[in-house]
Design a protein with these regions (language model features):
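Aromatic-lined, polymer-binding surfaces characteristic
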Residues: 1-114, 120
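Extended polysaccharide-engagement surfaces of secreted carbohydrate-active enzymes
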Residues: 63, 68-281
């Protein structure tokens, strides 16, 4: 197999983790018992999941940022759900998923622009159907009531939000929802969360004065990350963004046009494109 001993040691081989690995997993188990090679394929896929996923760390944040997080959603849900049904063990019990629920909420509160990290984050203007659908899946599979309240808050004003993007290639969870009959849990909600949360291993922090009502909330996001500008992360080290009413006030500049063009490098990825606190002031 091409990926053996390479993928395990790659910090973030984006497309493989986003889609190829999930597709390989499902294909390998489909032909298990019919093709001799499938024994090795299934063993590799299962143990690679245990070793490297669901996240690169334990705090639950996504170092590649707010936009490219979304293209991993199907993998983050469908693979552990498959193993859960196969074995009877809930693979969503990994503590990473509880931290990731907080990442979903704090990095982009209901009806707010995203915290502002990673390639193409400027396009993430409000929680998408795939993001809300992911929070819905997390709430059902982990019992996280904060994620459940996040879904209820947004669905109350956007009743069809879970239908938006529900069949998209990377983030659509329609197939999961057809299979999962677990209810949304009840309990503490957004108003019961602390004002802020720090994700120390990923180097992210987000603070909101009113997660329960974005219209009356000021928000600040901050990044100083050991992952640097690797992969789809950008060079916004020691950088912050500020928001009011879900809208950005002081925010990053530029657009993700490509990895190497002048605008993409200097006006989007580079440190000067962000509200960066430099070491010399």
């Amino acid at each position: 197999m091409h990926d053996i001993n390479r993928l395990e040691n790659h910090i973030a081989d984006n497309h493989v983790w986003q889609m190829t690995f999930r597709i390989l997993t499902m294909a390998a188990f489909t032909v298990y018992g019919e093709l001799p090679e499938a024994d090795a394929w299934t063993d590799y896929c299962y143990n690679l999941w245990l070793a490297r996923f669901p996240g690169l760390n334990k705090d639950g944040a996504w170092h590649n940022g707010d936009s490219y997080f979304h293209v991993n959603i199907r993998t983050l849900v469908e693979v552990p759900y498959f193993y859960t049904r196969l074995t009877g063990f809930n693979y969503f019990s990994d503590p990473w998923y509880q931290g990731n629920a907080l990442y979903v909420i704090y990095q982009q509160p209901p009806f707010s622009k995203s915290g502002g990290n990673g390639s193409s984050h400027q396009k993430i203007l409000t929680p998408s159907g795939t993001r809300v659908g992911y929070a819905d899946a997390l709430a059902r599979m982990t019992g996280n009531t904060f994620a459940a309240d996040y879904v209820r808050h947004i669905s109350a004003r956007q009743p069809d939000i879970l239908e938006q993007g529900s069949t998209s290639k990377a983030g659509g969870l329609a197939w999961f929802r057809l299979q999962c009959d677990k209810p949304l849990p009840d309990g503490p909600g957004l108003k019961d969360l602390p004002m802020g949360h720090v994700f120390p291993q990923s180097g992210l922090a987000s603070f909101s004065t009113n997660l329960d009502d974005t219209r009356k909330s000021a928000m600040l996001s901050f990044r100083s990350s050991p992952y640097g500008s690797t992969s789809h992360a950008i060079a916004n080290q020691n950088a912050f963004n500020t928001f009011w009413n879900g809208q950005s006030l002081f925010y990053s500049s530029g657009h993700h046009t490509s990895f190497t063009d002048i605008h993409g490098v200097y006006c989007h990825r580079a440190t000067r494109a962000h509200n960066t606190i430099l070491v010399n002031g």
